[in-house]
């Protein structure tokens, strides 16, 4: 078992990954750890507030490094202003780590088999599929036959008070231009 056994090879991989990939691994991990708590991600202002850090060059460089290395994506939630850009964690290993390994107190080599039909694993599969789509928008557009069309990628959700909500995980908004 590569994740859940006592000496599993990937048990400490999360920390090693950040230490080897980034100059300031603890700072970067704090951002990723926060983004791992909410599938829709957070705005820049929300990240700064929740982590109680200042806006500046270190934060900006950290976001750029995470974007460039495909750990996160930046998107504009449908129906909101351009100022409400969200940053969303899409790295598959990091998402898996946050859902299943981060708070794991014990080792259980049969974890996956014993939890295969659990609600937690079912929810994670949905999030994982959504993130695969978000990470491969160009391939999705090609499969849909719209690879040459200018688009914007977004997500949308609506949750009225005291009611169940509605959510669309991936919107591909087409920009069609007419020339006169």
Predicted regions: what they are:
Residues 172-180:
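Active-site beta-strand-loop-beta-strand hairpin of nuclease catalytic cores
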């Amino acid at each position: 078992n590569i994740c859940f056994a006592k000496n599993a090879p990937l048990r400490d991989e999360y920390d090693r990954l950040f230490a080897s990939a980034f100059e300031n691994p603890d700072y970067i991990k704090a951002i990723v750890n926060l983004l791992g708590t909410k599938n829709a991600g957070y705005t820049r202002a929300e990240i700064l507030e929740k982590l109680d850090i200042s806006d500046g060059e270190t934060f900006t460089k950290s976001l750029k490094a995470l974007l460039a290395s495909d750990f996160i994506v930046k998107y504009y939630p449908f129906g909101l202003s351009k100022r409400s850009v969200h940053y969303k964690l899409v790295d598959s290993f990091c998402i898996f780590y946050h859902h299943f390994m981060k708070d794991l107190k014990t080792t259980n080599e049969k974890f996956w088999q014993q939890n295969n039909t659990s609600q937690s694993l079912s929810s994670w599969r949905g999030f994982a599929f959504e993130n695969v789509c978000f990470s491969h928008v160009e391939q999705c557009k090609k499969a849909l036959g719209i690879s040459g069309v200018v688009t914007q990628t977004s997500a949308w959700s609506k949750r009225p008070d005291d009611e169940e909500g509605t959510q669309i995980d991936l919107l591909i908004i087409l920009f069609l231009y007419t020339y006169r």
